[in-house]
Amino acid sequence: VIGRGECADPQECKTIADLGVDILAAGIGNIHGVYPANWEGLSFETLAAVKEAVGDMPLVLHGGTGIPDDQITKAISLGVAKINVNTECQLVFAEATRKYIEEGKDLKGKGFDPRKLLLPGYEAILAKVEEKMNLFGSVGKA
């Protein structure tokens, strides 16, 4: 995907919200996966219009990986209640696992044991999730 991502029509969002859904994911310029260099950022104008149209309904931000922290916190302030960052978790998992193998740790002792080989990736995901929870303001909330 190139460019800025799709932006939802606020009235279509209201129509969907009126069906009784619990939470709504609306495009505000976000993209799944890694963002291209020419990405223009989130459309806060669209987000504000969607929020006005749907009222108290919590909003989801798909494609949260790679969005600058200041844009994430602004999106939260405008009604985003759930942010998906799975690509970011996958990237840190792969990086940590790759490092373990490139350092030859899988060849030492029982380093090939999946419980050992995958542990750095698991720990990298834990650290990333903790970082994101702090950024999102979700620590200590159910």
Q: Which functions belong to the PLM regions below?
A:
Residues 1-57, 69-85, 91-98, 103, ...:
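Alpha/beta enzyme core
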Residues 60-62:
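Structural detector of well-ordered beta-strand residues that form the stable sheet scaffold
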Residues 106-119, 138-142:
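Flexible, glycine/charged-enriched surface loops at secondary-structure junctions
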Residues 114-117, 121-135:
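Short, hydrophobic-biased amphipathic alpha-helical segments
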